[in-house]
Amino acid sequence: MPAIRLQHASVPMTTGGNDQGRHFYGATLGLTEIPPPAVLGGDGFVWFAIGESGDEIHLYTDESGPNSPGQHLCIQVDDPAAVREQLEANGYETSDTDVIPNRPRFFTHDPFGNRVEISAILGPYS
């Protein structure tokens, strides 16, 4: 029974970081905020939909922060250069990394220190 796709990534944020998360993932990256299930209580959670695919990012309150330098989530976009420009215009630093064929990409960090890869998929890896 193979996996079908990654449905969501859960990303830690600091207590009281809801507005910062909304600015980074919502206002800056253009994701649509969706309500988390009421059973979770609400205040320590901010969820976002990515397009119409059903993919989601779930921000949750956790003071331990990001765990390792390689931990990250990747958001696929059509135009990484335009997204990079938007991030930098909003004060977020970006950095290049190893080139992967057909995957123009760069990295940034959300307001909570989580590493975020922004990438386009132009074809197969090789």
Locate predicted features.
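Conserved beta-strand in the GNAT
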Residues: 57-60, 117-119
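Short, charged/polar surface micro-motifs in flexible loops or helix N-caps
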Residues: 52-56, 64-66, 80-81
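N-terminal beta-strand motif that seeds the catalytic metal site of vicinal oxygen chelate
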Residues: 1-22, 71-73, 124-126
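Short glycine-enriched loop/turn motifs at secondary-structure junctions
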Residues: 4-5, 65-70, 100
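Mid-chain, well-packed structural core segment of small domains
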Residues: 69-87
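Vicinal oxygen chelate
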Residues: 1-4, 88-126
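Short acidic/glycine-enriched loop/turn segments that link adjacent beta-strands
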Residues: 40-44, 67, 100-104
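Core segments of cupin and vicinal oxygen chelate
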Residues: 11-54
